[in-house]
Structures are given as structure tokens and as C-alpha cells.
């Protein structure tokens, strides 16, 4: 793992660079689900299974981009009393193994204050921040705070993002550019859209940093197809959160369930 003196942006760059000739694998997990210690165990299982980075969600009451599986896990975490403080505690422990990119909606971020939030995130050892509902027009202050704290503010683009907007967003990307593979919310889908290669080529033409794909990737075959379409990184969320939720409901170990899936996904990217 990169030394703790590196900035978060540098740790993310190192994680992508350490995956030569293949796409980096970034599992998404819900912070504080099933509880803080449980989410740390899941994050450590991801590291053991071959993940390169981890995306850690902050549970929120009105998550616009989350599909039903991730929304339900976030609701359970909130009902169990998980707070942002607890998620940052989990981030600090997972960050000892892998770079952690926090996914947080704008409301908790703005309520806490942008500079304070960025400082707390950096102090926890996190490497980056994704704010899915942060408008480009309001991103300036957040990006300045993240830059000052050494954090990568990772923007999202969609297949429907027009060229002029892509040209405005991509050069400001830090760490990586998050490309949403489909229009809509997160969730499992039957396959990788045939148009993905074109979407990725357009993104990579404008992006100074690696381009990662998320939303709708749930199998090793999907992951391999996204990589073949040109993705520098592959983000898998709903499938892993569903496995963790099913394990909790069944009284089995969610960390083991996620480990087995991440190992299979990592294998799909290492073929």
C-alpha cells in the first residue's frame, strides 16, 4: 500500500498503476452495514480477495442514485444508528489496506461544511470523494476543499452527458472519472450495454485520469466485458451489497460472501 504520506489522489493513481494490463476492481460497500465493525470486515475481505480500491457509501435517507438493494442496506444502517462518524471510523480502518473513496450525497456534506468534511475525510485516511448529486456549478468549493486536503473529487458522467458538458467536467476530474454505464439508478442488469465502448472512448478522450465504470456490473463476465470495452476500472455495488444482506438475513458471514464474489470478479479481470 502507498505510504500514508502520499495524498489521497496519489494513492488512487498508485492503485490504478498497480493494475497494469487490466482494469482495477473497486467494490462498493455500504458504510456501517451491517454495523461499523461488519463493514470493516467486508472491506478487509475485499482486500484479501483482490480488490484494488474500495468505494464506501455513506447511508442517507433520500439516495437519488441508489437502486433498491443499496437503498435498503443504507436504511438498515441508519436504523441501526450509524452516523457519518461511524462511517469515517470504518473508512480509517479499511484505508489501512486499500485506498477508500467515500460516496456521500450533497446534503450531509453541505450540512457539515465543505472544508470541515474534507478535513475529516482526509484525517480518516480516505483518498477520495464521490458526490453523485453535486451539480457542476456547485462543485468548485468542494473541489477546492478536496484539493487542499489532498483528496480526489471524482465526478460522474452518464451516457447522456453532452459533449460540451463532458468537456467541462472531465478536465476537473481527480483520481478517476466515474462513468455511469447506463441511465438510471444503481442495480444489477443482464449485461453490459453495447454502446459502452463508445461512451468510454468519448470519456477517455477528455479525461486526464483513468476512467472507471459503475452501475449495472454484477458478474465476472460483466466486469471482463467492461474492461474489454476500455474501462480502466470496474465498480461493482448492488451484487455485493445484496450478498452481504442475504448473508446477514441467513445468519451467515457477510464478509465471506462478499470475499467469494470479489475473488470471482478479480479473476474475471485477470484472465
Where are these regions (language model features)?
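Glycine-rich phosphate-binding active-site loops on the catalytic face of alpha/beta enzymes
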Residues: 52-63, 124-130, 135-138, 177-187, ...
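Alpha/beta catalytic cores of nucleotide-metabolism and tRNA/nucleoside-modifying enzymes
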Residues: 1-4, 201-212, 218-271
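Active-site beta->alpha loop and helix N-cap motifs at the rims of alpha/beta catalytic domains
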Residues: 3, 11, 42, 47-49, ...
Amino acid at each position: 500500500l502507498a505510504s500514508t504520506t502520499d495524498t489521497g489522489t496519489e494513492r488512487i493513481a498508485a492503485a490504478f498503476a498497480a493494475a497494469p494490463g487490466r482494469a482495477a476492481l473497486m467494490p462498493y460497500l455500504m458504510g456501517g452495514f451491517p454495523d461499523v465493525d461488519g463493514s470493516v470486515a467486508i472491506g478487509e475481505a475485499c482486500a484479501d480477495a483482490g480488490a484494488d480500491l474500495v468505494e464506501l457509501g455513506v447511508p442517507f435517507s433520500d439516495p437519488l442514485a441508489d437502486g433498491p438493494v443499496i437503498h435498503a442496506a443504507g436504511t438498515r444502517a441508519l436504523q441501526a444508528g450509524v452516523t457519518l462518524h461511524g462511517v469515517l471510523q470504518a473508512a480509517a480502518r479499511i484505508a489501512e489496506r486499500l485506498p477508500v473513496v467515500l460516496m456521500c450525497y450533497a446534503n450531509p456534506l453541505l450540512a457539515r461544511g465543505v472544508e470541515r468534511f474534507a478535513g475529516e475525510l482526509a484525517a480518516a485516511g480516505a483518498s477520495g470523494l464521490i458526490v453523485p448529486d453535486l451539480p457542476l456549478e456547485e462543485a468548485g468549493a468542494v473541489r477546492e476543499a478536496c484539493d487542499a486536503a489532498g483528496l480526489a473529487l471524482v465526478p460522474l458522467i452518464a451516457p447522456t452527458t453532452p459533449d460540451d458538458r463532458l468537456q467541462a467536467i472531465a478536465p476537473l476530474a481527480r483520481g478517476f472519472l466515474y462513468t455511469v454505464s447506463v441511465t438510471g439508478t444503481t442495480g444489477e442488469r443482464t449485461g453490459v450495454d453495447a454502446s459502452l465502448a463508445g461512451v468510454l472512448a468519448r470519456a477517455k478522450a477528455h479525461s486526464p485520469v483513468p476512467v472507471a465504470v459503475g452501475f449495472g456490473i454484477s458478474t465476472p463476465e460483466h466486469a471482463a466485458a467492461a474492461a474489454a470495452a476500455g474501462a480502466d476500472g470496474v465498480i461493482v455495488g448492488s451484487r455485493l451489497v445484496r450478498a452481504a444482506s442475504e448473508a446477514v438475513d441467513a445468519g451467515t458471514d457477510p464478509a465471506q460472501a462478499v470475499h467469494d464474489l470479489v475473488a470471482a470478479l478479480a479473476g474475471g479481470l485477470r484472465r
